[in-house]
Amino acid sequence: MLCPTYTPSVYHFQTQKPVFRKQRFRVCSSTSGGEDDRFKVEYTPWLIVGLGNPGNKYHGTRHNVGFEMIDVLARKEGVLMNTIQSKALIGIGAIEDVPILLAKPQTYMNFSGESVGSLASHYRVPLRHILMIYDEMALPNGVLRLQPKGGQGYHNGVKSVMGHLDGRRNFPRLSIGIGKPPGNMDMKAFLLQKFSPLEQKQIEEALEQGSEAVKTLVLNGFNQGISRFNLVQKYKFHKV
């Protein structure tokens, strides 16, 4: 288990080997029954992963909204995404006092689990604190859904992640609706298509709303606030 202890100037994730440093907290392996206050469990870090494809050609496509959510979180929380580890672009920071590790796997969507499994193991993040963020065709464009667990839902990225987490599904996930392909449009072509101006506006609003939901989850868990968030999202485009 990882646990952070407060220091005035720096914090860093420490597991099998040192990685790199940021400000405000020190995250280290915990011990039981010790007398040293530095090893007191205060906060459990979160691994927050956005799924997508690397490279400029995929930027702004429907399949990459998970990456875009990570970009919004990094901007809002002042996290620098400047390190490559476990085939992922990562950044370490905090939401208030809770340490977070943001990650964008660079393996391409269908192999995302290679990065997630490695990072979760290296930093010893418990399953309940691995938040997966990805696109969802079963939801209307711009509609969000935050759940404590679920299946793969025919999403190859989520399928890969579950495969590298020993088939376990009890990790939270934030789904970002992108709608369904119109008519007989090929699904792959739809996923790699950029949004229309109206759709893009809906996605940008969803990313802002989603970032606040992630903050609520990290600080308070799945409370009534998350339930209200899901209810509002479900009916956000319904006209009375």
Curated annotation (Swiss-Prot):
Gene Ontology CC: chloroplast stroma; ribonucleoprotein complex
GO molecular function, one term: peptidyl-tRNA hydrolase activity
InterPro entries membership: CRS2-like, Pept_tRNA_hydro, Pept_tRNA_hydro_CS, Pept_tRNA_hydro_sf
Self-association and partners: Part of large ribonucleo-protein complexes that include group IIB introns and either CAF1 or CAF2.
SUPFAM superfamilies registered for this protein in UniProt: Peptidyl-tRNA hydrolase-like
TM segment ranges: none
Purpose: Required for the splicing of group IIB introns in chloroplasts.
Location in or out of the cell: Plastid, Chloroplast stroma
Taxonomic source organism: Arabidopsis thaliana (Mouse-ear cress)
Keywords of the record: Chloroplast, mRNA processing, mRNA splicing, Plastid, Ribonucleoprotein, Transit peptide
Protein name: Chloroplastic group IIB intron splicing facilitator CRS2-B, chloroplastic
Record family assignment: Belongs to the PTH family. CRS2 subfamily.
GO biological process, one term: RNA splicing
